């Protein structure tokens, strides 16, 4: 439920639930990330949660450049979630049919902003380490620089703190702290308590 709620802003903004032809999927989502990469959950559940068609892509094809365009067109792919490094390898024409492009996993290079924007397409920059269930915040890319990671999504909290855990002022540097419903936990309560300790200065019971 955490991941689905995290995807909601981008999905709603892209109007994926618009008119659909009877008997046809409303959208086609590329599944191009390795399942060993946590961001693959974004592709899978994005499609399943909204009745879209999930289209697996061969890993060798995703890593290539010119071969991606014809594959995306042939498979009617309209939604792509990937990392900037990969999308930078693809020719602009490869994304002609894509109306929702979600990027994350690494910094968004400024030089990609103009190249990826197109009429009828929304581009989102997302941030969230594996420890925070893939996505904790997101921002629509508008062309304004620098490219931002956005505000926390529903159920999440973000804060930038100093060395003593106190929130810093606007324009000041500090460490980004994440709190919220999707922080990881597993079979070792002691290790969980160590890695996701409380942040009393923020009033958070768990933080990363």
Q: Across the structure, where does each feature detected by a protein language model lie?
A:
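Gly/Ser/Thr-rich phosphate-binding loop
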Residues: 44, 49-54, 78-81, 87-148, ...
